[in-house]
Amino acid sequence: MLFHYLYPLHTEISFFNLFRYITFRTIYGGLTAFLICFLLGPWVINRLSRMQIGQFIQNDGPETHFEKEGTPTMGGILILFSLGVSTLLWADLTNHYILITLLSMLLFGAIGFIDDYLMQVKKRNMGFTARGKFLVQIMAGLVISYLVYLCPDFDTSLSIPFLKNFTPDLGIWYIPFATLVIVGTSNAVNLTDGLDGLAIGPIIIAGVTYMIFAYVASHITIASYLQVKHIASCGEITIVCGILAGAGLGFLWFNAHPAQVFMGDTGSIPLGAILGTIAVITKQEILLLVVGGLFVIEALSVIIQVGYFKLSKGKRVFRMAPLHHHFELKGWPESKVIVRFWIIAITLALISLSTLKIR
């Protein structure tokens, strides 16, 4: 919005020429998102507390979690609001990738909100049924994937890390593949969101990482030098990534241990979907397995635990899944689990960035 209204004034006032630069709008978009979260956070937390929308702790969880009972949840509203407003202010709203990313946030945000609403307000213990939620996510993912597929400059070939000459073209089959990426990431982030700041930290890290990927892909000279597929229109996604990181930092101010608020499904489900959508748009969908490796590990721990439990008729691989609970039950303090998982996320992000040179 600011781009559309202020940039045309650059012929009269040279300062407004800054608004044509993606780097400028990325930095100030991120700062705007941070400030919105930081300033509105206390009001949102107080409002959620007054509405008695508090976290429910299951009896089979770690004992240290019982003190979290009643902590305001559905704080994802704060993240999505700051993300949406900042994107509307700083991004080019005529860019189709921006509109698709915003739609992804709205669709999956609605799914997460309804799930939280059923649990917290209507007091349905588990919200959506697992099958029902997955079906709705698939439908939303198909819509987003189809819209990306229709974009005139979008390529349905895959970018395989370390194999620059191997780019299989999926054609129409890219739609179900992209749906799998978006829905899978959405659920993986949701599973990771079990400790104070555990999910939002890696989201910030992934946002910064994809900010670099998006900028590289949109810059024809850099993309050519690094042998990365050039996608001119995805430059605006750089701004969304910066805003995602800024909103995440603003939320982390209140979500850091001991948390004053939890994001709930209202935050984790759409944030994962946004990350998956960005990975698809920037043609770094395979590399998301590395960038979001922590989310992958957490999701795999649940799959392994459930599968082994059924096959072995009651035996477990981990003391509890997702994996972060396993380490808690081994005696690790919550803060140690969180920071060590963040370190893993940073390491994986650095490895993924190295693929820009190792091709």
UniProtKB/Swiss-Prot annotation:
UniProt feature coiled coil, ranges: none
PROSITE patterns according to UniProt: MRAY_1, MRAY_2
Catalytic activity entry: UDP-N-acetyl-alpha-D-muramoyl-L-alanyl-gamma-D-glutamyl-meso-2,6-diaminopimeloyl-D-alanyl-D-alanine + di-trans,octa-cis-undecaprenyl phosphate = di-trans,octa-cis-undecaprenyl diphospho-N-acetyl-alpha-D-muramoyl-L-alanyl-D-glutamyl-meso-2,6-diaminopimeloyl-D-alanyl-D-alanine + UMP
Stored InterPro entries: Glycosyl_transferase_4, PNAcMuramoyl-5peptid_Trfase, PNAcMuramoyl-5peptid_Trfase_CS
Assigned EC number: 2.7.8.13
CDD domains cross-referenced by the UniProt entry: GT_MraY
CC terms in the record's Gene Ontology section: plasma membrane
UniProt key word GTP-binding: no
Entry's transmembrane regions: 26-46, 73-93, 98-118, 134-154, 166-186, 197-217, 234-254, 261-281, 286-306, 338-358
Single GO BP term: cell division
Localization annotation: Cell inner membrane
Protein's recorded name: Phospho-N-acetylmuramoyl-pentapeptide-transferase
Top EC class of this enzyme: transferase
